[in-house]
Amino acid sequence: MTAAITQLKMLFKPQWRKALIAAAVAAGFAPVMAQETFKVGIVSFLSGQAAESFGVPAINGAKVLIDSFNKGQAPAPYNKVGFGGMKIEPIYVDENGGATKQVQEMRALYDRDKVDAVVGYVGSGDCLAVAPVAEEMKKFLILYDCGTPRIFEDGKYSYVFRTAAHAAMDNVSLARYLKAKNIKVESINMINQDYAWGQDSKKDFTLAMDQIYKGAKVEADLLPKFGAGQYGTEISALLSKPADILHSSLWGGDLQAFILQAGARGLFQKQQAVFSAADHVLPGLGEKMPNGVILGARGAYGLMSPKSALNDWWFDLYQKANNVYPVQAPYRMAQALMGLKLAAEKAMAANGGKKPTPEQLAAALKGSSWQSPAGTITMALGDGQQAIQDSAIGRTRWDAAKKMVMIDDIMRFPAECVNPPANMKTEDWLKAGFPGAKC
């Protein structure tokens, strides 16, 4: 016993402690790794109309991916344990409740829970509210989903990033798809939610169509409130104004409700539905989803995702854990967490293996590029803090044998074909006729 105690004392002598630390560093592990975790606040809708088809799948994606990271079971270059050896400790927060509540919740994550980063926010109004607050606090924030281009076109940030493309991509892709498929468009009906996402989507689609289908006329232009749920009046208005296509950026429970109510009244037999962000409702709606709907997924996600070893691994990981395939929300969450992981490890490689500061994380993520299950993510816009990526558009078809909605006639568009260049705002780019687009 005495000999054992003597050996323990020897380990804690200064020279032995230094030797152990040096050995740890030489082996590629910094001392921080033994005692520290990396805390991440993860925010998405866990209740309300956006939870079932969007928020909960996003959180489910975060859970399976973080578990794989912490076990060191993800494929390279994501195969290091946790973030550079630090175990990832997630704190999940419900996004429901409005922008003011989300600002309070985010402050609590940073101040009370001492998170090292926040990854979150689906609602464009929420993103517009939290981004300047995180910047003021000098805290690291990744916006993983929200679509409004205004974040980086109307503001300048050092600590705020968005690791997915904004809404311009979705609507330019739809317009290009319609033209490529020789779909007649002389008249357009529109229904979009009356807040930043819906307003921006409506504007971007209209401006894109002005270039590709010159002379096409907008008939009905409807803006129901977010979370309306009942669309009888709007459906009557749409039926009263015949049009070649019906454009919508509705999403979540709003989109599900609209499809069920409009389908029952035969709207989709009379007007070609063109939905910018609809893939996430396919598993829930099943055979109630109309055939032939043209839709996007806000990226090359889910049934429109590219073939790759990384995507095969991710698709299988999510599907086995949740008994359903991943749609856009978990894909966007995955690319955010993968970008954060690589940024953290890049920063640690430069700082001697210590937990990175917000400034070090920002420097590592700014202007970077990485492979995700959906393809390459490049921080090309917003002074290196706004991502661009490839997109995909297709048509729905119910497969009775598989008992699921399939997507056929898929077209993929390169990131630089459907996103504005770094030196132009979205509206200016659309009005100028897509200068610099590489298709």
What do the PLM-derived regions correspond to, one by one?
Residues 2-20:
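Bacterial N-terminal signal peptides that target proteins for export
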Residues 262-335, 345-351, 406-437:
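Extracellular/periplasmic periplasmic-binding protein-like sensory domains
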